[in-house]
Amino acid sequence: MPPKKGGDGIKPPPIIGRFGTSLKIGIVGLPNVGKSTFFNVLTNSQASAENFPFCTIDPNESRVPVPDERFDFLCQYHKPASKIPAFLNVVDIAGLVKGAHNGQGLGNAFLSHISACDGIFHLTRAFEDDDITHVEGSVDPVRDIEIIHEELQLKDEEMVGPIIDKLEKVAVRGGDKKLKPEYDIMCKVKSWVIDQKKPVRFYHDWNDKEIEVLNKHLFLTSKPMVYLVNLSEKDYIRKKNKWLIKIKEWVDKYDPGALVIPFSGALELRLQELSAEERQKYLEANMTQSALPKIIKAGFAALQLEYFFTAGPDEVRAWTIRKGTKAPQAAGKIHTDFEKGFIMAEVMKYEDFKEEGSENAVKAAGKYRQQGRNYIVEDGDIIFFKFNTPQQPKKK
């Protein structure tokens, strides 16, 4: 059953995965495709980036600020004492090889590292370099993408069987009626994952009860994926590479709606070694730009995260929430008392604030809104919360 299409294209997938905002996106790919170099330039860290299949054994984790012109504008406007942007948590995971689900390479350890992440930067290599060996002997990014997909799929298939066997023993043969709905849902998952051999996230009509069960098991193929294509510096600058069209065709066919972002690890490394002035000159001379801001934003969005702002002379801050969060729960991100004693959210749209020039001007234009507890916070809202302070119990 293909994903349903809405009026604006592909129907967005349901949110499957851990609930919360401290979510991680893992960099996944075959060995020697440029994962550690990408992680280094993304986080300005120095994880080992040797030409060796398993140079990253323990996943390196870092967090990177999410670039946002709105945040920058609010900081310039308020000139606050404290500036706190939103952050994306990124994990560099060692290279997967064919047969990983059976323990090949460092197999199951790597798959468990992926399981601990909430989304995937699927990095594939589309550059030739005789000095950097390819574990499969040749450069073919479409083949490499298929290998990773197959390993994740096979691991999920391997997981489903024991879960159903255990539930069948208790819910069917043991007569535990409470677990029967979970058993039925897992049978549906089995039909989709094993019989039809499709990733969990490709089914766009999981209901709330089914998602609750899926979230207990965190299947690898339920994780959202952003495809990153590592090009040579030359190909990235000239925006040409023989593999790009083939990769896009594959993704459109097998992972519709997923983003494909070309970048060049070599270019990003070069830019990092230049001074700010030299970097600007180099980018202008080659009529190009870094792909990192776009990649960071795409990873953040893939995790179904967004943020609202609190802004003033003391602090400008981006508060990370899940998409669909209501005002009281958003207030609770600041302090639990804000949620418990929630009265209302006073909301300005960033665009209105920038256009009108001040909070008072937004109010005068009738664009300052008072929202109740059913208001769903939108990305980029500037919010001031009103709340009652909980009464302290009287001492006896």
Swiss-Prot record:
A motif (Nuclear export signal) lies at residues 267-274. Residues 304-387 form the TGS domain. One of its GO terms (cellular component) is cytoplasm. Its main location: cytoplasm. GO terms for molecular function: ATP binding; ATP hydrolysis activity; GTP binding; metal ion binding; ribosomal large subunit binding. Keywords: Acetylation, ATP-binding, Cytoplasm, Hydrolase, Magnesium, Metal-binding, Nucleotide-binding, Nucleus. Residues 23-283 form the OBG-type G domain. Its cofactor is Mg(2+). It is found in: Cytoplasm; Nucleus; Nucleus, Nucleolus. Mg(2+) binds at residues 36, 56. ATP binds at residues 32-37, 231. The modification N6-acetyllysine is found at residue 294. Signal peptide: none annotated. Hydrolyzes ATP, and can also hydrolyze GTP with lower efficiency. Has lower affinity for GTP. Monomer. NCBIfam families: redox-regulated ATPase YchF. Belongs to the TRAFAC class OBG-HflX-like GTPase superfamily. OBG GTPase family. YchF/OLA1 subfamily. This is Obg-like ATPase 1. The lineage of its organism: Eukaryota, Metazoa, Chordata, Craniata, Vertebrata.
